């Protein structure tokens, strides 16, 4: 990850730009739903809506946690489950300790580049009711 304001790295072209970010904390007993709120805040900061989003990467600390988030988004009519973890999530491809953020952001940036879609959301549940979310904008030159 490179902060472009600090100068470009010769020979490296950025894949994506962080367009918005959000955090949220629930009571610990409601931990699984925090990514839903964090993602909504990130979208608001990016000044886009779920209708603009083509890809979602959601960490799977536990299967039920991911299902709870997708179910909450479905109940609101916000997200097509087909765009969530389209290449498999942590249960399928691994969940290295301390690497969830890098894994979901990297996977999302590459999904956007491969598809040519412009917007994606990465969200992670980080424990004890907390969550982080980031909106990425594809700037790789293949954005639609």
Which residues are covered by each model-predicted region?
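Claisen-condensing/thiolase-fold acyl-transfer catalytic domains that form or cleave C-C bonds
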Residues: 1-144
């Amino acid at each position: 990850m490179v902060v472009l304001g600090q100068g470009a790295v010769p020979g490296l072209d950025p894949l994506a730009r962080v367009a918005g970010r959000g955090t949220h904390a629930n009571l610990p007993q409601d931990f699984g739903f925090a990514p839903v709120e964090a993602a909504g805040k990130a979208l608001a900061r990016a000044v886009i809506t779920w209708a603009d989003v083509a890809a979602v990467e959601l960490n799977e600390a536990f299967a039920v946690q991911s299902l709870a988030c997708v179910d909450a988004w479905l109940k609101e009519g916000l997200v097509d489950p087909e765009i969530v973890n389209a290449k498999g999530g942590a249960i399928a491809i691994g969940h290295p300790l301390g690497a969830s953020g890098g894994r979901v952001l990297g996977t999302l940036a590459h999904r956007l580049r491969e598809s040519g879609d412009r917007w994606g959301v990465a969200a992670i549940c980080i424990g004890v009711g907390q969550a982080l979310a980031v909106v990425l904008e594809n700037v790789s030159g293949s954005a639609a």
